[in-house]
Amino acid sequence: MTIAAHTLGCKLNYAETSDLLRRLAADGNTVVEWDHRADLYIVNTCTVTAVAEKKCRNAIRQAHRQNPDAQIVVIGCFAQVAAPEIEQIPGVTLVLGNDRKHMLPQIIRNEELEIRNSATQSSDATITNSSLLIPNFQLQYSGEDRTRTFFKIQDGCDYFCTYCAIPFARGRSHSATIEETLCMARRIADSGAKEVVLTGVNTGTFGQQHSESFLDLLKGLDNIEGILRYRISSIEPNLLTDNIIDFVAHSRAFLPHFHIPLQAGSDHVLQLMHRRYDTALYRAKLESVKAVMPDACIAADIMAGFNGETEAEFQKTLEYVDSLPISYLHVFTYSDRPGTAALRLGEKIPVPVRHEHTARLLELSERKHRAFIGSQLGKVRPVLWEEGERVKVKGETEGDSHLSPPTSYHMLGWTDNYIRICRPYDDKLANTIENITLTTDNILNVNE
């Protein structure tokens, strides 16, 4: 059977899709690119915003257009909370929520895929407490890229921020033990990957049900031979302790790159969101990072148009973010999520105003990122060069292909503090680290 998959949403989803495809390939199936004709299409979905859900529907319809006779399996967060709706989309064969998506290889082996409702009961049609009972945790990692791997170390969340449906889609916080996680990390090292990105829904809560700590996991990972770099994909500000900051600053392999969600620069709005910090604590965390890692890259999530936010509070957010040593923003436009407490909060912001606020935050992000890049010019930073296809940059065109020997192509890499770098392609450098002086000629001004 030929299988193609499309992943929407977070790095956690990418790790899960990759692991699923690896298991399906081990069963003798052939994995093809998403835009190829396939016998089976898998859509791993996201429910974080209404826009994300729209993209999920579009992906399902695209698969059906590519091969109307193909079977389509929809998995993930949107599948967990909206199975009855998804089942009505033409072409959908099976809907598996987060609690049973790991069963797909077994379903295919047992030739049960034709039975439309064989696992749809796993996804609650509405957001209820029963959907919080996601039963087991599986350590998973992405495997397509030998340079950089996304490693799922934690799942679920206990925070129940008023705007967020993810705890209903993924359950409460759960993880493996440190020993089990380190064992999987050694397997990743054996695969040849040099950089590992630790992913989860709320990574800082790792190990709580085992009376273990995230910091102790970091210490164990730092001792694993073969892995040269680790990044923490995201950590809540109230969980980013001084001990974690100090450890990262002096560790062997953890990089000066943090993603610290903010969401708003107004204490009143943060309270409405049920965030577990205020602006004073958030500023203190960033100052602590910069005190020991002055060149660290710090990214932040920010939300535009949350219910009840006034224009004055939005302006306060702009001014607050502008005053922080933030390198760039991930901007989300608020949308109502069924079953969340935010539906009952304050006056709804008109959609055009939400989009205007989003645009202003994106402009601020661009300015902050340019300033961060400018602060790094002339400095020497270690770059991990990526394997993979050669890319054309700096104005080269496809029409010049007859003039394009390998030396006209470039390879890409990331500095330790998350700046995108390019250089003329050299196969010998792939998956190695090289110290590079940063200039306007070798920096690509992109965020990923």
What are these regions (language model features)?
Residues 10, 207-226, 273-276, 336-367:
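Radical SAM enzyme [4Fe-4S]-AdoMet core and its adjacent flexible, acidic
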Residues 60, 185, 218, 245, ...:
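Generic structural signal for well-ordered alpha-helices
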Residues 1-112:
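Cofactor-cradling patches in redox/metallo enzymes
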Residues 344-402, 406-448:
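Terminal RNA-binding accessory module
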Residues 144-179:
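Canonical Radical SAM [4Fe-4S] cluster-binding loop centered on the CxxxCxxC motif
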